[in-house]
Swiss-Prot record:
PROSITE patterns: BZIP (PS50217). Keywords: DNA-binding, Isopeptide bond, Nucleus, Phosphoprotein, Repressor, Transcription, Transcription regulation, Ubl conjugation. One of its GO terms (biological process) is regulation of transcription by RNA polymerase II. It comes from Homo sapiens. This is Transcription factor MafK.
Amino acid sequence: MTTNPKPNKALKVKKEAGENAPVLSDDELVSMSVRELNQHLRGLTKEEVTRLKQRRRTLKNRGYAASCRIKRVTQKEELERQRVELQQEVEKLARENSSMRLELDALRSKYEALQTFARTVARGPVAPSKVATTSVITIVKSTELSSTSVPFSAAS
């Protein structure tokens, strides 16, 4: 049997747990500064110091995790609100777009009718065989309204 030339000093200087350590609540342990913590840890055994530091680290991590959860939920709610808002705006713009397309189609139809009318007026008298079968515009001249312009109406 061999003996260890260096005796374990931790066994010689053994203190009772809690002998010098005042009891710290979780809130106190988390909220105190490192300097304050080190002052409280003076005179404690390595095991007690390790246990208190580990407990402090665990409590702080719990706080950070709770904070992250709250932040994540808040961000998710904000993104959901923005998504709904943008979806409503897209639907509104789609309705406006549809309305404008209908208006554009109506204006295009009127424009084409006016162009057709302008071409027939520019050609002069049209022979009945050359009249387009898809659209017919009738111009009526009245002797009473010879000095005023003739009202025009085209089917749209």
